[in-house]
Amino acid sequence: MRTPTLLILVAVCQPVSAGESVRNKHELNQWNPLQASYKIHSGSTAYSEPPTKADSAITVHFGGTAAKRLFDQIGPDVKEGCSDAKGDRERRNKGVHCTFTARLQHPGNSHYRCWIGIDLRTGGGSARVPC
């Protein structure tokens, strides 16, 4: 189903200048600001190559309040996640992959991080984030 995945990406990537509905406080069911990075690639995000006609995807990465909101919405935690560190959690749902890291390596990092991936050939969800 490509429509739900595309709607999630549009909602997450809506620019800050979307109108008067953007407020300082992050709320559900309204447009909120998002600081994010994206990559258009083939393969996984860790070992990516330039996109090809046969394999092209976009992955959007973000943390902070937006990642926590998304993490809270896509539960439950996966049984076997990438991290075995105490307190770490992971949730996945088709093209959405979110993590909670209990112990941060750097004080400026966010406990919550999410990746949203879309296969640009099919429009389907494709979170290509390896462990």
Predicted regions and their residues:
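Sec-dependent signal peptide recognition
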Residues: 1-8
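Residue-level signal for mature regions of secreted extracellular proteins and peptides
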Residues: 6, 75-76, 91, 107, ...
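N-terminal signal peptide c-region/cleavage motif recognized by signal peptidases
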Residues: 13-15
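Cleaved targeting-peptide boundary
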Residues: 17-28
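Mature extracytoplasmic domains of secretory-pathway proteins
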Residues: 35-98
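Disulfide-rich extracellular modules and peptides
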Residues: 84, 100, 116-118
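Short beta-strand elements that form the blades of beta-propeller/WD-repeat-like
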Residues: 97-106
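Short, exposed beta-strand-loop hairpins at the edges of beta-sheets
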Residues: 105-131
